[in-house]
Amino acid sequence: MSKSTGSARVHAWLELVRWHKPSGRLILLIPAGWSLWLTPNAPPAPLLVGLIVLGGLAVSAAGCIANDLWDRRIDPLVERTRNRPLADGRVGLQEAMALLLLALAVALAVLLTLMQGLPASGRGLSLLLALAALPPVLLYPSAKRWFGYPQLVLAVCWGFAVLIPWAAATGSLAGGWPLALVWLATLLWTFGFDTVYAMADRDDDRSIGVRSSALSLGRQAPLAVAVSYGLAAAALGLAAALQGGGWIIWPLWLLAAFGMQREAALLRRPDLPRSAYGRHFGRQVQLGGLLLLALVLGQLP
């Protein structure tokens, strides 16, 4: 194998797990950060943060590979996805399966490391949550074939990015309202931004015969996104208030909440180019990161 061929192969692997587009990885890690900085034990230990980041990257990689395995016959028919490595043949089926197993092995190694510092009850809970997360993560890509709102399935997947870090930090899910609210905020935010992501593919999805919340909601999709973002910001703000964060949280929270509504309002413009939906997704990473920054600063003495 020549150096150029090897480099192209590695680049194809990175595309398969979407590491060439960091916004998609960050948008999973941000709710994990919300969770860690809202636990009673906040701020979290640096080692715990590092393990959660590594585990999140591994699970995200596994989810992306599973998505492309499910969609390898559909992706060539969709403008946005036709150049993905499995769709255009740069990565073979067996190669993708091997990478999927590797990603799951890394996620398992992270889980076992996290469990070492927990009491017996906490270890059992962490293992149960990890096992419960696996089916929706691997089956989510199939939801568009049988469910009109597959973005709800992704939201459930994202919810585990809140539950697992909380359990790893505290050894339980006895978080009361703060935990319930940050979990709900994550589900709502995820449904909103993934609905926008699906809006870019409406014409292709309609012609292929697959489903999405963008198609199911029709002209009401921008309103649904705005409501989802508004409720998500409210839930996260209430969770922060219940945990007693510092005053610095609130100006940043207001800025992020306003930004989310502004972005949702822009979706009402007629004849938006496909690129506008990608920019919206990137801005949600920024706004979600701003909310995380607010929580981090709120923990400072």
Predicted features and spans:
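Intramembrane alpha-helical segments
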Residues: 14-15, 62, 84-181, 263-268
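Membrane-water interface of transmembrane alpha-helices
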Residues: 63-73, 191-202, 259-268
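Transmembrane helix-loop junctions in multipass membrane proteins, especially transporters and channels
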Residues: 40-44, 72, 112-120, 145-149, ...
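Membrane-embedded alpha-helical segments that form the functional core of polytopic membrane enzymes
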Residues: 29-70, 80, 104-112, 123-138, ...
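Hydrophobic alpha-helical transmembrane segments in multi-pass integral membrane proteins
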Residues: 163-172, 289-301
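Multi-pass membrane catalytic core of lipid/isoprenoid biosynthesis enzymes
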Residues: 29, 50-54, 72-130, 207-247, ...
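Hydrophobic residues within membrane-embedded alpha-helical segments of Major Facilitator Superfamily
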Residues: 27, 57-59, 99, 103-106, ...
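Interhelical loop and helix-boundary elements at the membrane-water interface
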Residues: 2-26, 73-100, 137-157, 202-227, ...
